[in-house]
Amino acid sequence: DFIGSSTNVIMVASTTLMLF
């Protein structure tokens, strides 16, 4: 679960960076 959460956070961060 921890690894899954970390991956999810990284994906969200990457998406946010792409938007900006």
Curated annotation (Swiss-Prot):
Membrane topology: Multi-pass membrane protein
Keywords: Chloroplast, Membrane, Photosynthesis, Photosystem I, Plastid, Thylakoid, Transmembrane, Transmembrane helix
UniProt main location, coarse: plastid
Origin: domain of life: Eukaryota
Protein's cellular compartments: Plastid, Chloroplast thylakoid membrane
Any one GO biological process: photosynthesis
Family recorded in the similarity comment: Belongs to the PsaG/PsaK family.
Transmembrane segments: 2-20
GO CC, any one term: chloroplast thylakoid membrane
Protein name: Photosystem I reaction center subunit psaK, chloroplastic
Phylogenetic lineage: Eukaryota, Viridiplantae, Streptophyta, Embryophyta, Tracheophyta
